Amino acid sequence: MASFLNQFTRQPKIFGTLPSQGITYNQEVIQDMNVTSVPIFGMNTMDELILKTPDALFSGEATALVVKSCIPSILDPWKILTADMDYLLIGVRIATYGDRLPITTTCPKCKADTKSDLHLPSLLDNYTSQEPVEKITFNGLDLDIVPLTYEISTKISKDNYQMQRTLLHIDQQKDLSEEQKDLQKQTIYKSLSMLNFETVLHHVYSISDGQNVETDKEEIFAFVKNSEIGLYKLIEDATNIISKKFALPKVDVACSSETCNHVYKSETSFDYSNFFEVRS
């Protein structure tokens, strides 16, 4: 006999519409390809504990586990585009703690700190109002440029972090000459340049000539690498447009200092290590 407690288990608090419209997904990524009414649950105790594990946060595993717990229709969080991931995590925050996120900003005029609330549903609206694909044309080819997947974004962040750490380690080596340090750092700089190059190319979802469509990453990478530099520049410009479209908007803040009252715009950003903390 089922326990009466089952009727008190978590229920969806909100239903979301994915900004990407599921353009790159299949049924292995999201159940039934439902991208317009995605049920989002609040976090449970285990979710909160996972988000307090530094190694799991750094690897991206904590976020992936929380998404699978709070949004069970997402079957493979690693394949979710970053624009959708940010949207979903904001949704989880709303479902868990409510519509508002307390923030503290610094007045650029008097340097006083001001506490205010960020209205999270308006951020969700901002995400869904954006076109998820940038289309470019080059020599008769049509390219679809989309946000990175969470998997690729996480890998790039980890690789970049490790390379920056290596550069710092080289500088701290007292047994190396300046020439030896420069040689080692040049190797890292080349790797960073290649990482930046590949980051741009990972935004290319497909290339079409009107009759055929190529989505294989290896084929796309090889083609762009062997094409005129103009193609790469077009892709890079399109990725910058996407980044700006899905960046968190600046918020208007009135300085709390009675002698100032300056109204300023403040940038917002989310650090997922503390985004889900309860703040008063």
Give the role of each language-model region:
Residues 1-280:
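Long C-terminal interaction/binding lobes of large macromolecular proteins
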